[in-house]
Every structure is written in C-alpha cells, then in structure tokens.
Amino acid sequence: MEMEEVLSEVIQRIRPSDEERAFVKGLMEELRTIAEERIEELGLDARPYFVGSLAKDTYLAGDHDIDLFLAFPLETPLEELRKKGLELGKAIAEKLDSHEIAYAEHPYVRARYRGVRVDLVPCYDVGNWRDVRTAVDRSILHTRWVNENLRGRNDEVRLLKRFLKGINAYGSEIYVRGFSGYLAEILVIKYGSFLDVVEKADFLLRQKIIDPENWLRKEPEVALKTVKRETEEDRPLIVIDPVDPRRNVSANLSWEKYGRFYFKSIEFLENPSVGFFFPPEKPKGSYLDELRKRGTALVTLLINVPDMVDDVLLPQLERSARGFERTLEREGFGVLGWDVGRKGRAFIMLELDRERRERVKIKPGPEFFTERGRDFYRKNEKVWLIGKRLYSEKLVRESVVDVIIELLEKNQVSLGKGIRDAIRRADILLNYVPKELEEEAYLFLSREKWNIKG
C-alpha cells in the first residue's frame, strides 16, 4: 500500500465517530455537573478540570478513560488538600457506578461510570510552573498548553499514539518506559505531523535536546540545570516541559523503547503498512519447549508484596534481579537474562546456563608471602601453590535453588530495600511456573518480549 492509503485507513479506525464524541461530551458534562453540585454541597473552594487526552481531543476511538482533577486554592495546606480532596472524590463517586481508593503521590478515587473509568484526583489550582506543589498539578497546565498549540493536528497525534502502541513503545509507566501521550503531543506540535516525527527518529536522537517553549533562553539557569541533570542520567531525549523548565517530559523513556521506535520508524518509511499500527497477535508458545530447545534452566521467585504500587515495586525488583545476577555469576552460574513483574504475586525470573554446578569450587588466594597469604594458609584445610599464588578448594551446594537459599540466608545478595524480607520468604521454583506466568515465561525465554524485529 502507498503511504497515503495506509494513513487514511488507520485514521478511519482510530478517529472517534460522531456518536462516540457525543457520548464522551455528554459524559463529561454529567460529571462536571455532579462535581460542581458536590463541591457546593460540601462548601468547598475547589474547581473541576478535565485533563488528559479526552480534554485535548487526542484520544483514540474506544479509549475513554476520564481524568477529572479537583483543584484547590494554592493556600490550602497539603494535608488539608489530601483530606478534602479524597472526601470530595468519594462524594462524587457515590453518584457514579462504583469506586475504590487508589494511591500515587496522594490518595485519589478511581471510579466507573457508564462503562468508563474515571479518576478523581485532587490537585492545586496552578497558574504557572512556579505554583506547582505536587507532581499532578502540571496536568492542568499540560492540557491548556496542548489545546492552545495543537491547531487542528489532533489526528496527527492519534496516528503517532497508535503507531507507538502498535510497536509496543507507548506509555511512560514504570513497567513500559515508553513515550507518554503528552510527549507524543509535544512532538507533533513541535515538528508538524506524524510523518515529520517518524522521519526525524535519527535527528531527534542526535539533536538530543528539544525545547518547544525556549526555556533555555527564557529561564537559562533553571533549564540548564535540567539539561545537566538529565544528561548525567544518560537519557535518550531531553524534552524540556513546555510548562515547566525543571522537568524532562521524556525522563521515563528508556533507550530500549527509543531504539524500538528508531528501527520501526525506518522500517515503516521503507515499507508502509497498517500492520505497524495494528500488528497481528504474536503466536503463543510453550516455555517448557523453549527450555528444552535452549538447554537452559529457569528459576522463578514468587514474592508476596500486596500493598506496594508498581512505581515503587518494579525498580526494587529490577535491583534485586541485578543482585541475583551478580551473585550467581560469582558462584559459577551463567545468568543469560532476567525478567521481573507482577501477575498477582510479584516475580523474578532468571535464565541460567545450568541448574547444577560442580561440587568442588576452587578458591584462588593471595600471594603466599603476604599477611593475607599467611591468613589464607591458616584458614584452609588444603592449600597449594601455583607460582606465587595460593589456592584451595571447598565443597559447595550444587543445585542453584540450594545456592539461592543459602545466599539469602547469609544476606549475600543485594536486594531492593523495601522487598528484602519478602524475597527471603519467596517461593523458589525450578523449570516450572504457575499457569498465570506461563505466557510471561515463554515471552521471556524466547526473547519475544523484547524482540524488535518481530
């Protein structure tokens, strides 16, 4: 297909219909009315704002999550905002179909109404970046900036969002680390269209710094501090937030997800296809078949951490997986890869070159004529010399599961601070996972989870 045909077909599938727009508009009007009534009933000084893709008209057909922010005056103490904001959110949610309390920087209410998820989030009623007190406050400014600058390019944003979803690079959540919707909107506003953005996949990487509101000129001291900090963190891109020079919009974007975007953009421009936007479902496979084919071993730790949110949990799981990788390699096992996540219980998967090691481990020691050499000689039962260096041996546990248990008992693995105790109590499985993890184990072992050529 020609490029124009591809884009035309995709737009027809992702642009909301008139009926869908009418439904969304009516829903938002109902929610605004309910919010205003509840604010008045409770005697609160607050204003409801819709933020996010519905408020900017950059949402994809069928994607109707609503973000309703409940903005309190700047002089409101933070604890009072949290308390009254949650009270107001609950009062609004009582008029809806169902709700629960969720937690981010502060508690908020997650509700359902007419089949649509509605997040009711307390925030400050900010006018500019200097007013920002909490992370969510910027959302009001983001919505305002996009609406003022998009100038009818809504479908271009939709194309970019759908492309990023199709290549598995969309979402700034900690378990994705891709492009946020706001970043997609900024790139279209800055460069003009979906095609302009994908054509600049290489240029963006080389340019590195994107400053749509010229903060480096208007607030050089603040903006340069942001650039320096993010450069030291080795980010793929530094996109200075158009509404706040202190923030890099692409701070959560990983090199892996940018690399995926980089190669898929090249492939799409060479051979345009609707499949980039709506890829076929990958064939399912058996993790046990993969294990047999690879001749490797799979160790899975199942960890109970019910009250920990993903943004806190996942970095700690990753740190722990790296700790296991380093320690097991010191113990003589080759770690070919690891995977972490949560499917009910949290998990750490480790692929190893083998499940058992030799019963005897050689211990290289120091040179014999040193104080450490004399100490090594005293402490070991069998000692021999090769040249100037001392050597000994010791009997060790062979099974990797036994080795892991011993390492955890002796506190010899660097683990995430908040989950150390939970990992010590983890169930450790060898070459087996429960049913809910079978697909994850296959995707991990086959590397289809990360394969950018698929």
Curated annotation (Swiss-Prot):
Annotated Pfam families: CAA_C, NTP_transf_2, tRNA_NucTransf2
Family as reported in the entry's similarity comment: Belongs to the tRNA nucleotidyltransferase/poly(A) polymerase family. Archaeal CCA-adding enzyme subfamily.
Protein name per the record: CCA-adding enzyme
Catalysis: reaction(s): a tRNA precursor + 2 CTP + ATP = a tRNA with a 3' CCA end + 3 diphosphate; a tRNA with a 3' CCA end + 2 CTP + ATP = a tRNA with a 3' CCACCA end + 3 diphosphate
Entries under HAMAP family matching the protein: CCA_arch
Note: A single active site specifically recognizes both ATP and CTP and is responsible for their addition.
Residues that, per the record, bind ATP: S53, K56, H142, K161, Y170
CDD domains given in the database record: NT_2-5OAS_ClassI-CCAase (cd05400)
Lineage: Archaea, Methanobacteriati, Methanobacteriota, Thermococci, Thermococcales
EC numbers on record: 2.7.7.72
Species of origin: Thermococcus gammatolerans (strain DSM 15229 / JCM 11827 / EJ3)
PANTHER family linked: CCA-ADDING ENZYME (PTHR39643:SF1)
Biological process terms in GO annotation: RNA repair; tRNA 3'-terminal CCA addition
Cofactor(s), by name: Mg(2+)
Binding site for CTP: S53, K56, H142, K161, Y170
InterPro entries associated with the record: CAA_C (IPR048833), CCA-adding_arc (IPR008229), CCA_tRNA_nucleotrans_2 (IPR042090), NT_2-5OAS_ClassI-CCAase (IPR006116), NT_sf (IPR043519), NuclTrfase_I-like_C (IPR011068), Polymerase_NTP_transf_dom (IPR002934), tRNA_NucTransf2 (IPR015329)
Enzyme class: transferase
SUPFAM superfamilies: Nucleotidyltransferase (SSF81301), PAP/Archaeal CCA-adding enzyme, C-terminal domain (SSF55003), PAP/OAS1 substrate-binding domain (SSF81631)
GO molecular function list: ATP binding; CCA tRNA nucleotidyltransferase activity; magnesium ion binding; tRNA binding
The entry's keywords: ATP-binding, Magnesium, Metal-binding, Nucleotide-binding, Nucleotidyltransferase, RNA repair, RNA-binding, Transferase, tRNA processing
Transferase keyword on record: yes
